[in-house]
Amino acid sequence: MELYLDTASLEEIREIAAWGVLSGVTTNPTLVAKVFAAKGEALTEEAFAAHLRAICETVGGPVSAEVTALEAEAMVAEGRRLAAIHPQIVVKLPTTEEGLKACKRLSAEGIRVNMTLIFSANQALLAARAGASYVSPFLGRVDDISWDGGELLREIVEMIQVQDLPVKVIAASIRHPRHVTEAALLGADIATMPHAVFKQLLKHPLTDIGLKRFLEDWEKVKP
């Protein structure tokens, strides 16, 4: 299972990319807006494009960039503009009627599409049939309403395997390291997570205790 970072922060991407385990990045309008607001910079079309190019050059893998349009025609136009920014860009579309229409057209043009905001296996099936390269079920948000995000992911992965659909599953809306473990065990192709969760994957108190003990023992015997 590949590991993606769900962020628009170049600093966070550079930090995790240095570990040698980062395969891609997912962004959304909220994440991008936060980055520009924090810098006090205007979010112009040129600045946004430059920021996406910098992300692509840093990660070296797929970078999902989401449209803000709600109607298919506008989604297609915006998707083309996003895809033209860099070859690594994957156009992110909402799983709606208009999103499906746009997905069909963009994928027919050879533009990769990540269908997002998926909360059912049927939505994933529709997205795959519309030509999506990726489908993104939201584990955490499903858990939030007392449903089972893991069960949703299991259904989608199994359905795609049974139907032999050429689409990758991105486990999204990941809230904690257990979601990552669950996604890997259930057969997700990719898990995308916030920077904080990525850092938590590496942390374990016994690792810190063990390292401290090794160093203390070494200090006792070294020349």
Swiss-Prot record:
One of the GO biological process terms: carbohydrate metabolic process
GO cellular component: cytoplasm
Compartment(s): Cytoplasm
An MF annotation (GO) of this entry: transaldolase activity
EC number: 2.2.1.2
Substrates-to-products reaction catalysed: D-sedoheptulose 7-phosphate + D-glyceraldehyde 3-phosphate = D-erythrose 4-phosphate + beta-D-fructose 6-phosphate
Keywords, sorted A to Z: Cytoplasm, Pentose shunt, Schiff base, Transferase
A Pfam family: TAL_FSA
Domain of life: Bacteria
Catalytic residue list: K92 (schiff-base intermediate with substrate)
Pathway involvement of the protein, from the record: Carbohydrate degradation; pentose phosphate pathway; D-glyceraldehyde 3-phosphate and beta-D-fructose 6-phosphate from D-ribose 5-phosphate and D-xylulose 5-phosphate (non-oxidative stage): step 2/3
UniProt similarity note: Belongs to the transaldolase family. Type 3B subfamily.
Main function: Transaldolase is important for the balance of metabolites in the pentose-phosphate pathway.
Stated name of the protein: Probable transaldolase
Naturally occurring in which organism (per UniProt): Thermus thermophilus (strain ATCC BAA-163 / DSM 7039 / HB27)
